[in-house]
Amino acid sequence: MGSRIKQNPETTFEVYVEVAYPRTGGTLSDPEVQRQFPEDYSDQEVLQTLTKFCFPFYVDSLTVSQVGQNFTFVLTDIDSKQRFGFCRLSSGAKSCFCILSYLPWFEVFYKLLNILADYTTKRQENQWNELLETLHKLPIPDPGVSVHLSVHSYFTVPDTRELPSIPENRNLTEYFVAVDVNNMLHLYASMLYERRILIICSKLSTLTACIHGSAAMLYPMYWQHVYIPVLPPHLLDYCCAPMPYLIGIHLSLMEKVRNMALDDVVILNVDTNTLETPFDDLQSLPNDVISSLKNRLKKVSTTTGDGVARAFLKAQAAFFGSYRNALKIEPEEPITFCEEAFVSHYRSGAMRQFLQNATQLQLFKQFIDGRLDLLNSGEGFSDVFEEEINMGEYAGSDKLYHQWLSTVRKGSGAILNTVKTKANPAMKTVYKFAKDHAKMGIKEVKNRLKQKDIAENGCAPTPEEQLPKTAPSPLVEAKDPKLREDRRPITVHFGQVRPPRPHVVKRPKSNIAVEGRRTSVPSPEQPQPYRTLRESDSAEGDEAESPEQQVRKSTGPVPAPPDRAASIDLLEDVFSNLDMEAALQPLGQAKSLEDLRAPKDLREQPGTFDYQRLDLGGSERSRGVTVALKLTHPYNKLWSLGQDDMAIPSKPPAASPEKPSALLGNSLALPRRPQNRDSILNPSDKEEVPTPTLGSITIPRPQGRKTPELGIVPPPPIPRPAKLQAAGAALGDVSERLQTDRDRRAALSPGLLPGVVPQGPTELLQPLSPGPGAAGTSSDALLALLDPLSTAWSGSTLPSRPATPNVATPFTPQFSFPPAGTPTPFPQPPLNPFVPSMPAAPPTLPLVSTPAGPFGAPPASLGPAFASGLLLSSAGFCAPHRSQPNLSALSMPNLFGQMPMGTHTSPLQPLGPPAVAPSRIRTLPLARSSARAAETKQGLALRPGDPPLLPPRPPQGLEPTLQPSAPQQARDPFEDLLQKTKQDVSPSPALAPAPDSVEQLRKQWETFE
């Protein structure tokens, strides 16, 4: 590759000498060798040359005290290989210690010279001999190996294949400190054009460091012309040589050099940091490459490490990285390089002009010849330059490089035959070369895409896997866009149930999965297309597999990103109690809530119940995944079925956190009809209504808590009077009360419907017409519902629900659902973890459970307030487009005294038996004999634009049923308030007109008169 470094020297160093000026008669003569090792070294020509290079300055110069201590010169042997002379000047520059070696170990030999100088000063001859003998007999160690020469002398072998770094590399460090960026760029351009270059400095260590450092920036190319890091006085005529050179001159010799005829010489003065050049080499280079290089060098982050060297390496790759596209590969023929193809590849005029000149440069020719020699000899090569080309894709080299590999594959028959017969080592090298670079290219591109994906999503893939998995082949994923879509980062999936997967995983076309890790790498025989990191894992197998692959093979907890670790740890008890059949599908990974869409045709989706999809027949808004509960009580098995914990209609009182399910009675069923997600939501309510399945989240519980606690995602900021946050606050004026009720309209969840219906399969779909002709028993039940002062409601205890009759109570209004068009529902586990699943329900009926309330046998401490409304998923059925009944929270000291104050707008808490409100916004507090009337809670209010859920007015004969009972003689404390607001209360125009007597009766009932 044009390197002038000898690859396998026989010894670590050739000779060690101590050179000094002998004093004869008070005058200085030529320097002489005072001592040498080994003593039998017989190359007198080398020894004479060493003595002159050890003092490359005028000894009687005034600047002799500034020469510094360590410097390096270079001697070229007959094979054009460089031998480095590492020197250390003594104080006063009268003597010099020098080691001549083929190894460019600058820091190592500088350290050894200091030790040897110390031994010489202290006259420790034994240590001096022992150190030199050990070093001279030492076999050349491998890079990175620590070598111990004596008790106090050891070193680590440097790796010359790596990029030089700051401050480890002494030459690059001094060069970067001494020369500014602009002069470095000018010097770099002059070296690319192979100019005659002189570098001047008054300090020898800095001078030689600048020469070696600037030449190292040409990697992977090497300066092929005259190379003299420090020029001795007897060779000053080299400055007039017509060929290109790179020479360093001490400042004491520069005055004589100025008197020479120097034509077209680039001079860099390091002391003054100035550069003189008659050429416009920097301006003639492609501007985009130079601008990028300049920006990288000026960044503070590149001042340490290999940033400076890598910046120049990127520039070299941008200039010459497409050389591989010009390689001509023919079967049974040596690989050659086509200069025309190399130049014509680029469209830019500046780049074409530069490359046309570059093909004539000696350093580029030596580089190409070195690469071709390695390929044709069968050795091959792989270095940081090739890695940079693969990673950077400079000048479209990635695409053309794979075209080159395709060309290799087209002649695969001849190549494979050649490899098998081992007749042509060049073809065998091409095969290995192409395979190695295919591996390198895939790895580097995926690493770049991985970094880009992490930057965009803010989350890395899961770091480890728990079970062996069968990874689908990339070709299967490329053909199946659904698989590719499903393999998104877990940050996108989290919070949404995935659509069902096929139960049988497609078998990979190639055996690329072993113990759950992808180990196959694209080869020239079987190319694999580039895929983003979301579609494929790393070829090395050290990146994590996608979460979907883990879900397919395991019914255990799904691994989550590191930031979710705390929440996922809480799932161990939930999933450990799963009791599923083998036929059930694995739980699909969750998606984000933005991707929720209602099914277009719900009849096409089969109603199969498993814990992967909870509601195949309804909208996806009713789905949920338990993500943050760790249950330690016996009811965790009900929660582990995958039901959304956000849909629990009630919170058990703190006095009895673990009531047995026997106290809560049986669960009840309600017919559900499919509807789209927007059928019962106004546009203004879609963002503000905290529905249990969309707006609610679950707060992760502390480990010590036993009962679940619900959290509500706060709606957009709404002005809310402070009196709503206290139970016993004063009412305030009428306008404030009305404004408060308007502000609370958004809190009414359309999915919160009170009441229950019979469980019989025949009565589930029986309609109850709300038309004007409805009367009789249905009217009696609905009219009884309108009476908030019913004795059954005001009683402290409620009768148990009969086991056999399927008759609705006066407090459980039936809902009219037309029997036609109702799809076949399917069972669903109860939403309340404390209520067992309904065992006798038909398999095609949806179960939306509710606390048993008045129909069970609640403890006396619970009171009638546990007759909570049935909580429905807002997207689970098609209710008529009408408002829901107002739920008035009554004064239940034994229950509401324990409820948190922040839950007064939550649709999740029990609100007692319902009371139907008029069309205007109004809250009907009920006067009770209890002295705690001040603790009355505010109920949920209706929207004024929606008609109330009211039946038609009853006949005149039924009017006495609306008359209030005994409590009407007691003066209502809110009578004055309601009298003032009576003019605002009017029946909704959507209702059928009723007689005046009914109107008066209704107003009389509303005002408790």
Swiss-Prot record:
Record's subunit section: Interacts with RAB35. Interacts with clathrin and with the adapter protein complex 2, AP-2. Interacts with ITSN1 and SH3GL2. Interacts (when phosphorylated) with YWHAE.
Pro residues: bias regions: 820-831, 945-957
Matching InterPro entries: cDENN_dom, dDENN_dom, DENN_C, DENND1A/B/C, Tripartite_DENN, uDENN_dom
A Pfam family matched in the record: DENN
Residue numbers covered by motif Clathrin box: 569-578
Keywords: Cell membrane, Cell projection, Cytoplasmic vesicle, Guanine-nucleotide releasing factor, Lipid-binding, Membrane, Phosphoprotein, Protein transport, Synapse, Transport
Domain of life of the source: Eukaryota
Coiled-coil regions, chain positions: none
Connected disease: Genetic variants in DENND1A may play a role in susceptibility to polycystic ovary syndrome (PCOS), the most common endocrine disease among premenopausal women. PCOS is a complex disorder characterized by infertility, hirsutism, obesity, various menstrual disturbances, and enlarged ovaries studded with atretic follicles.
GO terms under cellular component: cell projection; clathrin-coated vesicle; clathrin-coated vesicle membrane; cytosol; intracellular membrane-bounded organelle; presynaptic membrane
Membrane topology reported for the UniProt record: Peripheral membrane protein
Cellular compartments annotated: Cytoplasmic vesicle, Clathrin-coated vesicle membrane; Presynaptic cell membrane
Biased composition (Low complexity): 986-997
Function, in words: Guanine nucleotide exchange factor (GEF) regulating clathrin-mediated endocytosis through RAB35 activation. Promotes the exchange of GDP to GTP, converting inactive GDP-bound RAB35 into its active GTP-bound form. Regulates clathrin-mediated endocytosis of synaptic vesicles and mediates exit from early endosomes. Binds phosphatidylinositol-phosphates (PtdInsPs), with some preference for PtdIns(3)P.
GO biological process, one term: endocytic recycling
Modified residues (Phosphoserine): 473, 520, 523, 536, 538, 546, 592, 749
PANTHER family the record matches: DENN DOMAIN-CONTAINING (PTHR13196), DENN DOMAIN-CONTAINING PROTEIN 1A (PTHR13196:SF22)
Comp. bias regions, Basic and acidic residues: 477-489, 972-983, 999-1009
dDENN domain mapped to chain residues: 300-378
Phylogenetic classification of the source organism: Eukaryota, Metazoa, Chordata, Craniata, Vertebrata
Modified positions (Phosphothreonine) in chain numbering: 519
Subcellular location, principal: membrane
Span of domain cDENN: 162-298
Species assigned in the record: Homo sapiens (Human)
Protein's UniProt name: DENN domain-containing protein 1A
Chain span(s) of sequence motif FXDXF motif: 381-385
Regulation affecting activity: The guanine nucleotide exchange factor (GEF) activity is autoinhibited. Autoinhibition may be the result of intramolecular interaction between the DENN domain and the C-terminus, which is disrupted upon phosphorylation. Activation is regulated by Akt activation.
